[in-house]
Structure formats: structure tokens, C-alpha cells
A protein has these predicted regions:
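The feature captures the beta-strand-to-loop junction immediately N-terminal to the Walker
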Residues: 45-47
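Helix-to-loop junction immediately C-terminal to a conserved catalytic motif
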Residues: 60
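Short helical segment in ABC ATPase nucleotide-binding domains corresponding to the A-loop/adjacent helical element
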Residues: 100-108, 118, 227
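Conserved ABC ATPase "signature" region
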Residues: 108, 113-133, 185
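Hydrophobic anchor residue at the start of the ABC signature
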Residues: 151
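Catalytic Walker B motif of ABC-type/P-loop ATPase nucleotide-binding domains
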Residues: 162-165
Length: 256
């Protein structure tokens, strides 16, 4: 990463949640220092309740670190902004809006002309494979289709960094596998700096350029970093894939 542009940098980020008027303090993150280069697909992996979602929310500007700082293109992150797009585990679509309406919402709020925003939204509807569903409402869509809308909406707003918080955690195994394939395909077509959070090592190896693991207890601390030098598209049954997955599983003591 020596000659590559650093897009996101976390410097000694720590987070303590306070309860009962500050009488109870819960340390969630401790001394997280991390750099993500432009167009890198970074996956943060760890078990539940290890602080990885909190770290993503701090990068998004939705949480403030207790100590430390986050920088985007060298500028300190002080709150949410259009330069970061986020896809959540729970579906966050507007139920009264169609697929087209949901995807173009951010562009509309930004004052973009209708013709232009429809053109952009249409491009991403096509990219995520939802042609023919432009006029469908969220209640008419499957879970996988809803997340495709969420991903298309995030891409349509053209953020500098895309943040995904266990976006496939609520999907069945088959749909989750298909969405992993779609995510890898879309990223290959529309290169973007991506930070993806998951508790699945298998998913991490399939998607990542680099994997960062967090310890499985609070406060979350960085444990290891792995560069994934496997060709794309990847196959879960390839020898090299299985060897890397096994190595990470053994070294992090996480169960698949």
C-alpha cells in the first residue's frame, strides 16, 4: 500500500458507552488504528458483540469516538456526510416509495434534475438486476431484493466510501450466497472503497482484498490483518480459498 492513496484512516480510535448517568462505563473499542486505501475492499470480521459495528458507525460519523480520530481524504470526520454511503443489516427502505423512488431519493434531495436522477437510478437498477421492478414497493420484494435496492441507492449517491454492516445477516443461506456474488460483481464493475463488516470468515475471504479481524471480546481490538491474493471471481471450494479460510479460522479461534 506504499504508493496507494489512503482513503480512510482511523487513529487510535476508542469508544466507551456510558449508562446510568455515566456511573456504568462499557469499553467497546480500544486503540483501533487502521488505514484503507482507495478502491480497496476491506472486510472487518469478528464474532457478535466485538465492536465491529460500532467502528463502522464511527467511520460513518453516526457515533463519536471517545478518543482518537477518523480521517477521510486527510480531513477529520466529525459527522455523517454524503461522502459515505451506508447499507445496514436491517432494511432501511422507505415503504411508501417504489424501487425507483428509493434509489433516486438522495439525488432528489440534492436537487438533481428528474431526468438525470432517473438515468442514474436506472443504471444502478440494471446493475443490481432489478429491471422490471422499478415500480414495485418494498413489501413486494424479497429480502435479497430489498438489499439490492439498498446497495443500488448507496452507489447511486456516488459516495467516496461505501460502508456495509452485515448486510446479508438476515438472509437465508442460498440468498446470502447469491448476494455475495452480486456484491463482488458490482464492486468489480464500479470500483469503490468498501468497508464491509461480517461475522463470517467464509464471506470475508470471498469478498475481500484484505481482512482485518477483531478480538472476540470487549473492548474490541485489532488482532490480525490478511491480504487476500486470490483471483476473482472466487470459488468457495477452491483449494487456496479453503486453506486461507482454515488459516484465519484457526488463528482467530472463530467458528464458521
Amino acid at each position: 500500500m506504499t504508493n496507494e492513496t489512503i482513503k480512510i484512516e482511523c487513529r487510535n480510535v476508542a469508544k466507551i458507552f456510558k449508562q446510568r448517568g455515566g456511573k456504568v462505563q462499557i469499553p467497546v473499542l480500544d486503540s483501533i488504528s487502521l488505514s484503507v486505501v482507495e478502491n480497496e475492499f476491506l472486510v472487518i470480521v469478528g464474532p457478535g458483540q466485538c465492536g465491529k459495528t460500532t467502528l463502522l458507525r464511527i467511520i460513518a460519523g453516526l457515533e463519536t469516538p471517545t478518543t482518537g480520530n477518523v480521517f477521510l481524504d486527510g480531513k477529520q470526520v466529525t459527522g455523517p456526510g454524503p461522502d459515505r454511503g451506508m447499507v445496514f443489516q436491517k432494511y432501511t427502505l422507505f415503504p411508501w416509495k417504489t424501487v425507483m423512488g428509493n434509489i433516486e431519493m438522495g439525488l432528489k434531495l440534492g436537487g438533481m434534475a428528474k431526468k438525470k436522477r432517473r438515468e442514474i437510478a436506472g443504471h444502478y437498477i440494471s446493475l443490481v438486476g432489478l429491471q422490471g421492478f422499478e415500480k414495485a414497493y418494498p413489501h413486494q420484494l424479497s429480502g435479497g431484493m430489498k438489499q439490492r435496492v439498498g446497495i443500488a441507492r448507496a452507489y447511486a449517491n456516488d459516495p467516496k466510501v461505501l460502508l456495509l454492516d452485515e448486510p446479508f445477516g438476515q438472509l437465508d443461506a442460498q440468498t446470502r450466497y447469491l448476494m455475495e456474488q452480486e456484491t463482488a460483481r458490482i464492486w468489480s464493475a464500479e470500483k469503490k472503497t468498501v468497508i464491509f463488516v461480517t461475522n463470517s470468515i467464509d464471506e470475508a475471504v470471498y469478498l475481500a482484498d484484505r481482512i482485518v479481524t477483531l478480538e472476540g471480546k470487549l473492548p474490541g481490538r485489532m488482532k490480525s490483518s490478511y491480504v487476500v491474493n486470490l483471483p476473482r471471481p472466487r470459488e468457495h471450494i477452491d483449494k487456496e480459498f479453503l486453506e486461507l479460510r482454515h488459516m484465519i479460522t484457526q488463528e482467530t479461534e472463530l467458528l464458521l
